[in-house]
Amino acid sequence: LLFDLMRGHMDELLAALIPKGIAGAEAAPIERLERFVRFHIHFHLERPDAVFVSYMELRNLGPENFAVIEGLRRRYEDHLETILKAGAADGSFAVPDSKIATLAVIAMLTGVTTWYRSGGRLSGEDVAGLYWEMVRRAVSA
């Protein structure tokens, strides 16, 4: 059951990401990064329970199921790392280690579900905008 919930979340996340054109090279890295940040925030704010299970219960999976979920997470993280590497290559981002930057950004973005409450002081769009500004400043050259 736990594996099925996690697999469903990751499959849904990856399926929703692809049509957004985030990983494609047609846009500048800064535009792709903004799309990624906003997508991640909105997707996760709509599913806080699934996010909690998917990120906090990984340790409770057996080795085979852990490897499957870890592979799906890696595929998702690779989209962000590709953007960060492209931005570093064109001089718009300063990320000395793209993998560490990827993990740091993902952790920051995913953490929003621990405190955000619908109907609170900020809308989901407000939060996405604030997080985008923080991420942009963190990686800008």
PLM features: residue spans?
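An amphipathic alpha-helix adjacent to DNA-recognition modules
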Residues: 1-18, 34, 38
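Amphipathic alpha-helical segments enriched in hydrophobic/aromatic and basic residues
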Residues: 2-9, 51, 69, 124
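Amphipathic alpha-helical packing segments from all-alpha helical-bundle domains
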Residues: 8-18, 64-89, 99-103
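Hydrophobic alpha-helical connector segments
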Residues: 18-49, 102-105
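Hydrophobic/aromatic-rich alpha-helical bundle segments in the mid-to-C-terminal region
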Residues: 51-55, 66, 88-133
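Short helix-capping/turn signature of helix-turn-helix
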Residues: 55-61
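C-terminal alpha-helix
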Residues: 83, 134-141
